Amino acid sequence: MKVSDRRKFEKANFDEFESALNNKNDLVHCPSITLFESIPTEVRSFYEDEKSGLIKVVKFRTGAMDRKRSFEKIVVSVMVGKNVQKFLTFVEDEPDFQGGPIPSKYLIPKKINLMVYTLFQVHTLKFNRKDYDTLSLFYLNRGYYNELSFRVLERCYEIASARPNDSSTMRTFTDFVSGTPIVRSLQKSTIRKYGYNLAPYMFLLLHVDELSIFSAYQASLPGEKKVDTERLKRDLCPRKPTEIKYFSQICNDMMNKKDRLGDVLATAQRIRRRYNKNGSSEPRLKTLDGLTSERWIQWLGLESDYHCSFSSTRNAEDVVAGEAASSDHDQKISRVTRKRPREPKSTNDILVAGRKLFGSSFEFRDLHQLRLCHEIYMADTPSVAVQAPPGYGKTELFHLPLIALASKGDVKYVSFLFVPYTVLLANCMIRLGRRGCLNVAPVRNFIEEGCDGVTDLYVGIYDDLASTNFTDRIAAWENIVECTFRTNNVKLGYLIVDEFHNFETEVYRQSQFGGITNLDFDAFEKAIFLSGTAPEAVADAALQRIGLTGLAKKSMDINELKRSEDLSRGLSSYPTRMFNLIKEKSEVPLGHVHKIWKKVESQPEEALKLLLALFEIEPESKAIVVASTTNEVEELACSWRKYFRVVWIHGKLGCCRKGVSHKGVCH
């Protein structure tokens, strides 16, 4: 808003503007809520001058004694003439109303005053001392909540970009009172700016169930509690949905379009609007804050210990059946497995996916690769293991089906890929996300925030797969999705594990893999295990080590594909089908791999000769050297530094050191 436009707006919404600004006090009472709704507020300190008795603003040069006698107000700053500044403070019935929290050892009261006033537009909320321990968390962890709000606005931007023709988020927002622009088009460059403003509101909504501010609005009724709507309406300033601040305007169009994010963000409006307008016709709530807090916690993925309870919706038959069940059965963790509704699929989906990824000239390398890709995408085989040589195209065996799944408009599939080492993550994510065919993100995002509704494939390492937080989220997937997105069309797709033989061969890491046995494999559409060096004995032992049945007794050749029987028992109840593409006399057409087996007297010397020859011909190339022991890794790295720029890593390094090496490889 231009300075001239702002001054016109100030005068139009404050009838006594001229006379009030001629007041000698720096602090001036203003009854216009519209002015405070439309112009950014700030918190300033004021004091009463002993000599003149006037209210003056505390400036940097004001003496220490004046600051000690000061008090704080939420104000709108206005300019009188060229160099004179006045501050307007909002008042209702009482002049110079002072409300808000009591002093705290954690926070100065102005911060909470500003947060509560801006979010709820309420002047009568009171906090007790216990609330300060909760409210202080925002300022102690502000960076964390800032990042959460950034991601919420990024989600808004993604939705708006996908629907530029009907989304008001890509147009200029206009204040419905003054008709002047408030926020221009939401852009990537402004997400962080607005995210900082959204963070306090998000914090309050996430923690509102821990605060005492709404406890006074509970009216006891026979057998249950209900919101005292009359008292709430007296305390809350009546606002229209269109008079909210810009963070709610951002999602206004999406709410009209019934978008999932907008539906969740609408809880911010419900807090400030009249709750339960018609009393008896509205649903009865345990607490006013419970619904709001629950919805936000679920959508933002902060419910690591959350388990949905459907006890309130169970019918009489369910209760009787539950009481009749044996105690032994009750102690077991029951897994609900069922036939999943299959979306229409065809072999043409794979061909279309290949052309998206590689261009119109795409062709499969051989018939084996074609048939196995169709097996993974089309067949009901719940668990598949593939052994193929390096360079054969194992990645495409699941990459193309994932792209085909992502093309299904009536269902959203979320898949997971796990690799053994951190150093493989960056390149893997780049490869799988090229050409924008898939939305790829780290598994750490899923663990920390939950499903964002946008990502098609999460990529992580074995440690992520074994973590308790990951297994808990998968176990509660269907309940969380149903509560968060209010649909069953967001499904778990593939669980893909690369180089799965490491579960058996890496003895020193086996203690880290124990948590994988707690994973609910039945929740996934299909499990895919890949390796270049996993003979049947190793593959069978590796699968059993993570809690699966193991390989089918009879090894399946690639030419013996057939559909499996009914899947009602779940993925973990069936043996894994093994497809071996490495045969003694087969000639697999590898596109870019040249393999040589050599017996030499000194392996390090021979390896050094090969590397020197390689970099002489191709100076920009890179090479990976695998050593048999950790000591040999460090020795080779030290001795070869005079020839090459070396980045080295082995399993005994800590996470921090691995991260440094990972960055070095990416660089």
Curated annotation (Swiss-Prot):
Further information: Present with 279 molecules/cell in log phase SD medium.
Keyword GTP-binding listed: no
UniProt organism field: Saccharomyces cerevisiae (strain ATCC 204508 / S288c) (Baker's yeast)
Domain Helicase ATP-binding: 375-552
GO CC entries: mitochondrion
Domain of life according to the entry: Eukaryota
Region (Disordered): 321-345
Motif extent (DEAH box): 498-501
Pfam families noted in UniProt: DEAD, Sir1
GO molecular function, one term: ATP binding
Protein name: Uncharacterized helicase-like protein YBL111C
Residues that coordinate or bind ATP: A388, P389, P390, G391, Y392, G393, K394, T395
UniProt keyword list: ATP-binding, Nucleotide-binding
KW Nucleotide-binding (keyword) present: yes
Family, per entry: Belongs to the helicase family. Yeast subtelomeric Y' repeat subfamily.
